[in-house]
């Protein structure tokens, strides 16, 4: 039996691929990636076979691990597939906003069996939003890799790091019809 990893958006793909790279998973991992996730996984874990979502029914799956995309429904569709087929599902939340929207498919909530977060702030928000879903806090291996790269540049003094992993400009347009609703976007911040 295999573990199926499903991802689309960049933020979740960075965290999920770095997590997989650092784990010693003995089971076979099968990937179903779309969008920016494909190149991110190639950069972080090397070559892999990328399965089309329609071919998932052909394999025996033990567990499904997903990102949580804002701009794609692939993870939600696969979580729903897992639920219907009694396959354990867990999803990585890679940010601090739009939690419920990440699990909404055609106006219905589609929650995994477990939600994984990688910082204490996200853990607190997730505990409040998802009272009936177990929440697990793990190390953020992506953040550790970024910090390691920054430390290699010893000649520069860095006091603060702003990490924007969301296309917040698109979120602001969708939610408020104003790309600069918050006074900044992922490019100007």
What is the predicted role of each segment?
Residues 1, 158-161:
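Nucleotide donor/acceptor-binding cores
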